[in-house]
Amino acid sequence: MSYQEAWNPVDSSLDEIISIAASLKSKTGAVKEIFSQELTQREANVKKVHENLEELQKKLDHTSFAHKEDRDRLEAQIAQKEQEQKAKLAEYDQKVQNEFDARERAEREREAARGDAAAEKQRLASLLKDLEDDASGYNRLRPSKPMLSEEDTNILRQLFLSSAVSGSGKFSFQDLKQVLAKYADTIPEGPLKKLFVMVENDTKGRMSYITLVAVANDLAALVADFRKIDTNSNGTLSRKEFREHFVRLGFDKKSVQDALFRYADEDESDDVGFSEYVHLGLCLLVLRILYAFADFDKSGQLSKEEVQKVLEDAHIPESARKKFEHQFSVVDVDDSKSLSYQEFVMLVLLMFHDD
């Protein structure tokens, strides 16, 4: 076998190997291309995934921010509701406290009213007792028994219950004048006003039903007394009739009787008419009330200081007060430095003489 013949199979194998190698190289390039494309695609996919993740993170961040705003808004609403609820609770507590305070005030006012009513009842009882008591050596101006009839008392009670008293439960000065007009056509307003101020029960110028009945009874008594004293029924009182009446009332000193007559005889006619008598009676009733209030120890005597104090409280004119020292010594004939009711009346008459 020649060399060529022996080499041919080898060449054929080499060609086949070269062909296979070329084929492998071609396939390797294709595989590499495929791998390169897959790698590129994978990188693109990874990039896309990253982009998606970033987008998702942005969405998550936005959602978290939105949730925070919602949470803050919700917390603010809750805080506002809590404040409103606290305010309502505080308002309710204040309302309850105000109602409680109002009830306490009302209870205190009721207690005070009950105390005032009891004190007023005691004051009136003491006053009426003083007016009726003859233990000090003088009598009151009115008779011992009530002068108001049952019908008159019912009229006063109806007036008290009616709206004519302005719903206050007490009488004004005009109410008093209206009631007393039943007993006399003309009642001097000056002394009546003084009497009203002395016995009014509050600072608003009103008197209670009990006080009105007492005052009306006194006025009715004055009318009845005048008719009884006027023995000849001529409508006036002579000096003799006047003096005899006041002796019965305990004014036994002639000087006092004469002073009373001069005071009552305003027109200097030497007799005392009905209106003059009522005027005097009202003035004496005012003085009797002043004296009774000042005589705290019920001794029937007022010291000089007590007399001066009661006259100051009565707001007498300055011109009359200037006469006090001199006239007190004139009236206090026994130099006891105190005055009985009769001497007290005489003192006032002298102080107001020519005023």
Swiss-Prot record:
Residues that, per the record, bind Ca(2+) 1: 230, 232, 234, 236, 241
Domain EF-hand: 151-186, 217-252, 282-317, 319-354
Annotated binding of Ca(2+) 3, by residue: 295, 297, 299, 301, 306
Keyword Calcium on entry: yes
Position of the signal peptide: none
Keyword Cell cycle recorded: no
SMART domains: EFh
Pfam assignment, any one: EF-hand_5
Gene3D superfamilies in UniProt: 1.20.58.90, EF-hand
Binding site for Ca(2+) 4: 332, 334, 336, 338, 343
InterPro entries per the UniProt record, alphabetical: EF-hand-dom_pair, EF_Hand_1_Ca_BS, EF_hand_dom
GO MF, one example: calcium ion binding
Binding site for Ca(2+) 2: 265, 267, 269, 271, 276
Organism domain of life: Eukaryota
Keywords (A to Z) from UniProt: Calcium, Metal-binding, Repeat
PANTHER family: PROTEIN PHOSPATASE 3 REGULATORY SUBUNIT B ALPHA ISOFORM TYPE 1
UniProt miscellaneous comment: This protein has four EF-hand homolog domains inferred to bind calcium.
Protein name (record): Plasmodial-specific protein LAV1-2
Organism: Physarum polycephalum
